[in-house]
């Protein structure tokens, strides 16, 4: 049995002849601990947040450009970025980020083991990634009652019901990200209505216990720990 976290990857492997379709099973990512990442109150100031390694493939350039575009018209809005800069070809450097921080466009934070403290500070979570398995950060933000802006890309599109729990945008399109940010700003009631639906969707589809049950079922393994903590 071969386990995939999204149907796009499954289809790619099957169509390439790497695995037979009858051997494949799809689970909903790695799941999210809905107890740890529980619904939290929203901040007073509208705040957008991205948590990611600061890599091109995660959509960091699109996020920064979208923040810049929206900040010009809505200087009161807050934009956060949590993630380390790495010395690899696909990553922005601290020097690349510096102008955005110095101009007050974004607030950049390093690494932390208390990511939920940052989710609590945001109104909407943003991940303009080019491709994922299933993005755990999106699941965590959903579980905490945050509406999502992410891409219509493999792994990402499965996490959002477009228009109900958040919005899907095209890959590599900063203007589309900015447009959806603006929609939340101009219609702030969407933050709570889509956020509540997002939390419900996380519990229905992505809770870690449900995902682990599916995984064990596919692999014919009996679960001994029903309360896995992730």
Segments predicted by a language model, with ranges:
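Aromatic "clamp/platform" in nucleotide-sugar-dependent glycosyltransferases that forms part
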Residues: 111, 130
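Conserved donor-binding/catalytic core segment of Leloir-type glycosyltransferases
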Residues: 41-58, 63-68, 79-82
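A short, active-site helix/loop in glycosyltransferases that binds the activated sugar's phosphate group
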Residues: 1-24, 31-34
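Short beta-strand->alpha-helix junction loop in the catalytic core
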Residues: 8-9, 26-37, 53-56, 84-87, ...
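Short, structured helix-loop element that forms part of the nucleotide-activated donor/catalytic region
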Residues: 11-12, 78-105, 109, 190
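A short, well-ordered alpha-helix in the C-terminal region of glycosyltransferases
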Residues: 176, 183, 190-205, 211-217
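Short hydrophobic beta-strand element within catalytic cores of glycosyltransferases
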Residues: 147-150, 160
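Conserved acidic donor-binding segment of nucleotide-sugar-dependent glycosyltransferases
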Residues: 162-163, 167-174, 183-189
């Amino acid at each position: 049995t071969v386990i995939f976290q999204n149907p796009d990857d499954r289809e790619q492997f099957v169509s390439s002849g790497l695995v037979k379709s009858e051997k494949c099973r799809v689970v909903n990512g790695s799941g999210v601990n809905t107890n740890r990442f529980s619904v939290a109150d929203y901040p007073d100031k509208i705040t957008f947040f991205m948590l990611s390694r600061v890599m091109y493939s995660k959509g960091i350039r699109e996020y920064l450009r979208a923040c810049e575009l929206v900040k010009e018209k809505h200087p009161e809005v807050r934009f956060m970025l949590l993630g380390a800069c790495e010395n690899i070809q696909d990553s922005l450097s601290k020097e690349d980020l510096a102008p955005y921080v110095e101009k007050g466009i974004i607030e950049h934070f390093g690494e932390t083991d208390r990511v939920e403290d940052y989710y609590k500070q945001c109104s909407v979570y943003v991940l303009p990634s080019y491709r994922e398995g299933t993005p755990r950060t999106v699941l965590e933000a959903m579980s905490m009652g945050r509406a999502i802006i992410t891409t219509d890309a493999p792994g990402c599109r499965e996490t959002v019901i477009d228009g109900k729990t958040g919005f899907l945008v095209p890959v590599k399109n900063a203007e589309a990200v900015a447009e959806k940010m603006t929609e939340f700003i101009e219609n702030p009631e969407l933050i709570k209505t889509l956020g509540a639906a997002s939390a419900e969707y996380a519990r229905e589809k992505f809770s870690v216990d449900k995902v682990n049950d599916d995984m064990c079922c596919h692999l014919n393994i009996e679960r001994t720990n029903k309360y896995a903590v992730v």
